[in-house]
Amino acid sequence: MTDPAPNDQPSRAEILAFARNALDQDPGNAYAWSLLGVSLRGAGRLPAAIAAHWRGLELDPHDGKIWSNLGNALMDAGRLDEALVAHAQATTLDPGDALFRFNRLVAQRRAGDFHGSLESSDVLEGLDPDNIAVAWERALVRLQLGDYATGFRDYGARRHLSSFYISSLPGEEWDGRPLNGRRIFLASEQGFGDALLVARYVAQVKALGGHVIYQYHPELRQVLHGLPADEFHVRGAPFPDYDVWLFQMDLPVVLGARTDNLPPPVSLHVPDASRVKMAALIGACPPGILRVGIVWSGRVTFGENNLRATSLDAFMRLAEVPSVRLYSLQKDGPSAELDDPDTQRLVTPLGPHLDDFADTAAAIELLDLVVMTDSSVAHLTASLGKPVWNLVQHVPYWIYGDRNDSTPWYPTMRLFRQGADRDWNEVFMRVAEALHREAWLRGL
């Protein structure tokens, strides 16, 4: 048994029970220690998981399975350089093990070793040619490098992963040719940010002569009210009648997206009711003040949120900048970091008043700038044409590429990249310096 386990392997509870029983009988069982580590990793107890794998390696340093399991735990903990060493050791001990090689491939991509990841995918073509996850990893690397033509060839692989909610819909999938009056169903997928990202393509679909049925997340219905769709279909309702269909994230694929031909971001609709609500809450801006919105976490259910998110405390450095006033747009669990009434004197909590993306958009309209770690609010802000400073993890979402401080997808977005050391402190030092300069340029 090697972590991560295929779908037909035992549950975490079964692994934990087996490991405990084995260690009760023989504390010197090296692989039982590693199985304990696998279970601890699944429970999110990463320091203990890493220690358990090391205990196993102390007993048997030549077991490739334990090295690979250790590499996975280190990767989840963000200790990516150490993870690469562990995975390299696993593949050295057993070069022909496809799972060891795949785990190494994933770690290489997440550590930013893109060329190493592509080399591993080439090796896996011979070892495990039917592994669809390899194609998905290869797509992510190619897209990260800006090679959309090659990356999009494998982009459909995501639909065959166990994490994807449905691999296809009934009927004919649209291939991008003129619609000639046919009814096309644009099915939603993934998250809010992805929906905002590719909504820009709906106008191109409409221009190809179709009757467009757009599936939407309820939280986005108001801001996407102005899309040139003929029908709006809420996510979760039974599928409508249609002639052809396409997942929304495949719109850039079939419409031939390149870094030099991207349409402008979607034009969003902000209802008057939301504007009135936010104006009453935020009020008029006093002279000499720079109003800055902040967000420090995306949805905690997102698999890599621990890598892209930080904390409210990290943003407090920005409250030190003269003339800057912070407004929190943070929602859900992480917003509890702002429950302290003294902190609320320094950061105005807007999150509890934001019922949907329309309210958030109305709040952003009243701010001068949004500074945040990556989440759907970055897409929302940039689609509104407002300046957003997006603080991105070492290897971020593929639309942000692998270098530079800008992205062709959003002209008003400025990227502050985490370095290879994955140190947020250094990022916030640069952001604070930039904010000082921004205030000076505005004469504040």
Which positions does each model-derived feature cover?
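Alpha-helical solenoid repeat scaffolds of the TPR/TPR-like class and their adjacent stem/linker regions
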Residues: 1-444
